[in-house]
């Protein structure tokens, strides 16, 4: 599938969807507290999305790697869960949990996608360092989202930041194009081993989701028994941050920032 380039008018539409994503994600993150279930957060996200006249992008979405549709608006991954954690009534957040929330929305035919990781209550120094590193990796990567650079330059920025902190970047998972759909070409890897021969050049008009996923212990993952949740293979903590970014002649523009 070809990489789509968007006009300024289309990027403004993606920005509107992305701003809804940012607002909803902010509200959900504020409600991450010990004793709250991940299903409670799911209900907040659905209500806030509907209030803004948008639709959750993940709810009912069938990704290429699955035979079934995703049954929720949010992906909520806790502690050793990296991505695609299913919200559940019985999944109750505890003090010190590292909680990653990934959310996408569609508004007026265009999508936005973002993720944030927060700590419920007071977290360990190690968890706080992991969040700091992952967030830094995101912004270092965004700086490389310039016309003429390659996707792999974004990957290297993520990888080098992780290495500086002594952390790992997750293999086989990463960012992607965003626009008319929530997931488009190109794939934007987090781990340099995934760059490969397909390393497209960035061009003005591309819109991509950059989403570092770091772990304290390993780059390898395993799938949980629910068919969705991806965990670190060694059970170590993971964190995930994401922004939707437009590549313009003036530089990267973060569309999912409030």
From Swiss-Prot:
GO cellular component, one term: cytosol
Keyword set, alphabetical order: Aminopeptidase, Hydrolase, Metal-binding, Protease
Enzyme Commission number(s) from the entry: 3.4.11.18
InterPro entries on file: Creatinase/aminopeptidase-like, Pept_M24, Pept_M24_MAP, Pept_M24A_MAP1
Catalytic reaction(s) noted: Release of N-terminal amino acids, preferentially methionine, from peptides and arylamides
CDD domains per the UniProt record, alphabetical: MetAP1 (cd01086)
Biological process, per Gene Ontology: proteolysis
Binding annotation for a divalent metal cation 1: 102, 113, 242
UniProt-annotated binding residues for a divalent metal cation 2: 113, 176, 211, 242
Free-text remark on how the cofactor is bound: Binds 2 divalent metal cations per subunit. Has a high-affinity and a low affinity metal-binding site. The true nature of the physiological cofactor is under debate. The enzyme is active with cobalt, zinc, manganese or divalent iron ions. Most likely, methionine aminopeptidases function as mononuclear Fe(2+)-metalloproteases under physiological conditions, and the catalytically relevant metal-binding site has been assigned to the histidine-containing high-affinity site.
Binding site for substrate: 84, 183
Cofactor(s) annotated in UniProt: Co(2+); Zn(2+); Mn(2+); Fe(2+)
Domain of life from the UniProt record: Bacteria
Gene3D superfamilies per record: Creatinase/methionine aminopeptidase superfamily
Family classification: Belongs to the peptidase M24A family. Methionine aminopeptidase type 1 subfamily.
HAMAP family: MetAP_1 (MF_01974)
Function: Removes the N-terminal methionine from nascent proteins. The N-terminal methionine is often cleaved when the second residue in the primary sequence is small and uncharged (Met-Ala-, Cys, Gly, Pro, Ser, Thr, or Val). Requires deformylation of the N(alpha)-formylated initiator methionine before it can be hydrolyzed.
NCBIfam families, A to Z: met_pdase_I
Name of the featured protein: Methionine aminopeptidase
Species this protein is from: Aquifex aeolicus (strain VF5)
